[in-house]
């Protein structure tokens, strides 16, 4: 009985709100209010925007390094080892791996988007 009453109340309230919104007139209608706004860009213009592939590659590289740091760096402390040498060795290995991969990206000119 309570379920039926709750459903009936919700349905009635939703229907009432839809009817009120449909029948109320829009006040102060003018062209700027009814035109679409796309973050300062003209929505009626060309949909083709210039795309920088170098910037995209730098952004992807940043995301990869960021995920590596966020996911792999806590690994030595999450391994629950009591041996401090093992933990520090794992951490040092991961830091060296990140440094070597950063140096590789740098030498391959993967971090520059100006040519």
Swiss-Prot record:
Alphabetized UniProt keyword annotations: Electron transport, Membrane, Mitochondrion, Mitochondrion inner membrane, NAD, Respiratory chain, Translocase, Transmembrane, Transmembrane helix, Transport, Ubiquinone
Summary of subunit composition and partner proteins: Core subunit of respiratory chain NADH dehydrogenase (Complex I) which is composed of 45 different subunits. Interacts with TMEM186. Interacts with TMEM242.
Main location as per UniProt: mitochondrion
The protein's name: NADH-ubiquinone oxidoreductase chain 3
GO MF terms held by the record: NADH dehydrogenase (ubiquinone) activity
Membrane-spanning residues: 3-23, 55-75, 84-104
Family: Belongs to the complex I subunit 3 family.
Subcellular location: Mitochondrion inner membrane
Membrane topology: Multi-pass membrane protein
